Design a protein with these regions (language model features):
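Hydrophobic transmembrane-helix bundles of small-molecule transporters
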Residues: 167-259
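Transmembrane-helix bundle of Major Facilitator Superfamily
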Residues: 2-191
Length: 259
């Protein structure tokens, strides 16, 4: 996914509507899928013969992948260009959505949700960078505000959208509906999103791993505490988060271009 249109300078005079649809649709799908599965957990767990406690991983896997992937993928966007990360992100998200819709058991669904979350992280990590390019400088605040509105409203509407879908279809359609919409965002993005000039610095792989481990274990530990899980599921992840976070801060302080 590297055949781009000509690169555009930051702050074009006109906003490309198809490019905006690609970016905002991708962001909306990523935010929507953060909460869309919550309403359907009882139906999914019954259909897949899974316990209520185990089915929580349908939500957790997605959220962990998003949180763990945001910073490393944003840094990757600086290295290879925001357009490329966005396109690969929406492609992974769309394929994983199909995998979720076809999942025969809880393990498959949870793994597909994790991959879906990584795709969403790719989209969300570079969307502001793309908005900077697509919007004129004088209207950049409007673009950022619209992006925040779409993220917030999509997350809030997730349970309502899920209830609407479940009233006319079964739970796989919660994820299947993202496939055509993801393809639309991919096609529009492929044809309209401009190249960005990659930064000269290199991505530090150790920093990327530390960031993913720190935030992933932090969210896991806090989630386990909220679910009143056993102490090993709470204390150990939080200790790992604290240690990896401390190492991350120390390493970033000496880095020429911190993440």
């Amino acid at each position: 996914m590297t055949a781009p249109p000509n690169a555009s300078p930051i702050g074009p005079m006109k906003v490309d509507i198809k490019a905006l649809i690609a970016v905002f649709l991708g962001v909306a799908l990523g935010a929507l899928d953060t909460s869309i599965a919550n309403t359907a957990l009882p139906a999914i767990s019954t259909d897949l013969n899974a316990s209520a406690a185990a089915s929580v991983w349908i939500v957790n896997a997605y959220q962990l992948a998003v949180v763990a992937g945001l910073f490393p993928l944003a840094a990757l966007g600086d290295l290879v260009g925001a357009r490329r990360v966005f396109l690969w992100g929406i492609a992974v998200f769309t394929v994983a959505s199909l995998g979720c819709a076809l999942a025969p058991d809880l393990l498959w669904l949870s793994l597909a949700r994790g991959v879906q979350g990584l795709g969403a992280a790719g989209v969300m990590s570079v969307n502001i960078a793309l908005i900077r390019i697509l919007y004129p400088a004088a209207r950049l605040g409007r673009g950022v505000g619209l992006n925040a509105f779409i993220v917030g409203s999509s997350f809030t509407l997730g349970p309502s959208v899920a209830s609407l879908i479940l009233s006319v279809a079964n739970w796989p359609w919660l994820f299947g509906i993202s496939v055509p919409l993801g393809l639309l965002a991919l096609v529009f993005g492929w044809s309209t999103l401009p190249n960005t000039v990659p930064q000269a610095h290199k991505v530090d792989p150790i920093t990327a791993v530390l960031s993913a481990v720190c935030f992933g274990t932090l969210i896991y530990g806090v989630g386990s505490a909220a679910q009143l899980s056993g102490w090993p599921h709470i204390v150990l992840p939080l200790v790992v988060a604290a240690l990896s976070g401390s190492w991350l801060v120390v390493r970033q302080r000496g880095h020429a271009v911190p993440m």
